[in-house]
């Protein structure tokens, strides 16, 4: 299935408003005779002060319609056009407004001439650092030291080495990709899809894309090093130190190599499970670290933490600013939110005001495959009694079919452990 995303919500022209309204109304209606929730395209509503955030603004009615769609269909997600990390964009040029590619991937400032232009650029190659493994390797090398500060310093040095190794890997992959014949992606290069292409060397286009250094398992890493995660002050302090190292190095690499290195909060749909299995094989079961089948996605608050939507936003918003290649914050809500859109609006606006660049809401989306009844369903449909239930859940920034069949074992467990934030 093609991975597609559509960013919309800021065009105030009659034609643009009609298209946005049609997209949202179609999302709410669903597809086919059973009115299924659409998996793709991933809808992303671009929130922007003066355009759609408050009553009286020209597209506020479309924002309200977007909230209705989110409550019923999980889409759209919300991109923050006022995000501080997108400084220098042109409010009159929609191609520079903050947008994402669905799962969370985003284009930062292009060092090679296009600035905050988003269209025609993409994530050329990513690599992910499995931080809990680094933390355990560091701890094993320091078994004779009881000094926590020494352990942390050793970990930071080790992480720094791995960030440099990640950079070298990306440079090698970038060179290999640039060696490809334009015919390997003929549509992309011959239809002006990729900006900057000179018609000869694909490097002319690819140099405007992102080389992303990602991460997984911040929460478990903190647990290994200091015995708590970033829901605590001590955990957050170390989390910021870790993320600052990622950002500092990526900024340095960007200047040195004149390529768009960026910090990426990796989706890790499969890696969350496979990396944990290898970790368990080597280190066994460690409470609050490997007593489950997955590592926590990037810098997220662990799914089992009992926090409110506002608390989760407060915590993660302190870290999202370190990422310039893509991140997401989402909250888990009860199905009943569809009857309280004012509450949903307050949550989305809170995330935007907290400078979260990309925000999503998870609500149960179960559908009877026999009669089409859609709601949170236990074992059998309350309308017709059928047990063939399609259960959609968000895997990263997008939906991926019934999570019982589309997700791996680790991601299935993560979904089942998710605590409702409201």
Go through the PLM ranges and name each one.
Residues 383-422:
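Long, charge-rich boundary regions
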Residues 1-207, 228, 232-394, 400:
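Conserved catalytic cores of very large enzyme subunits
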Residues 211-224, 244, 394:
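Contiguous, well-ordered alpha-helical segments that form the cores/surfaces of helical PPI scaffolds
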Residues 177, 225, 419-421:
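Amphipathic, positively biased hydrophobic alpha-helical segments used for protein targeting
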């Amino acid at each position: 299935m093609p991975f597609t995303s559509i960013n919309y919500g800021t065009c105030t022209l009659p034609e643009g408003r009609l298209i946005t309204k049609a997209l949202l109304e179609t999302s709410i209606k669903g597809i086919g005779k059973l009115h299924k929730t659409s998996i793709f395209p991933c809808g992303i509503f671009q929130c922007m002060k003066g355009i759609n955030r408050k009553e009286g603004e020209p597209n506020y009615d479309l924002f309200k319609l977007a909230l209705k769609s989110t409550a019923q269909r999980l889409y759209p997600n919300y991109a923050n056009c006022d995000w501080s990390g997108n400084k220098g964009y042109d409010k009159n040029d929609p191609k520079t407004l903050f947008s994402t590619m669905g799962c969370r991937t985003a284009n930062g400032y292009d060092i090679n001439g296009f600035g905050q232009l988003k269209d025609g650029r993409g994530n050329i190659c990513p690599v992910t650092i499995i931080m809990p493994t680094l933390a355990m390797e560091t701890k094993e090398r320091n078994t004779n030291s009881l000094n926590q500060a020494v352990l942390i310093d050793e970990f930071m040095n080790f992480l720094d080495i791995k960030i440099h190794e990640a950079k070298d890997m990306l440079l090698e992959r970038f060179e290999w990709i640039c060696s490809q014949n334009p015919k390997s992606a003929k549509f992309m290069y011959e239809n002006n899809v990729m900006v900057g292409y000179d018609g000869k060397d694909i490097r002319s286009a690819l140099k405007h894309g992102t080389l992303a250094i990602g991460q997984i398992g911040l929460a478990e890493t903190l647990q290994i090093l200091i015995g708590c995660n970033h829901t605590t002050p001590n955990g957050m302090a170390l989390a910021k130190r870790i993320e600052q190292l990622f950002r500092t190095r990526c900024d340095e690499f960007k200047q040195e190599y004149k390529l768009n290195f960026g910090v990426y909060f990796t989706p890790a749909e499969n890696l969350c499970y496979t990396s944990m299995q290898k970790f368990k094989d080597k280190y066994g079961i460690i409470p609050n670290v490997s007593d489950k089948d997955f590592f926590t996605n990037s810098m997220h608050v662990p799914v089992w933490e009992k926090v409110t939507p506002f608390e989760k936003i407060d915590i993660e918003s302190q870290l999202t600013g370190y990422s310039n290649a893509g991140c997401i914050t989402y909250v888990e809500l009860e199905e009943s939110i569809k009857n309280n859109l004012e509450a949903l609006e307050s949550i989305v606006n809170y995330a935007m005001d907290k400078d979260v660049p990309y925000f999503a809401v998870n609500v149960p989306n179960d559908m009877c495959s026999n009669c089409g009844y859609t709601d949170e369903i236990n074992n059998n449909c309350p309308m017709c009694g059928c047990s063939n239930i399609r259960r959609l859940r968000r895997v990263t920034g997008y939906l991926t079919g019934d999570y019982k069949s589309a997700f791996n074992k680790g991601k299935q467990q993560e979904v089942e452990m998710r605590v409702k934030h409201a």
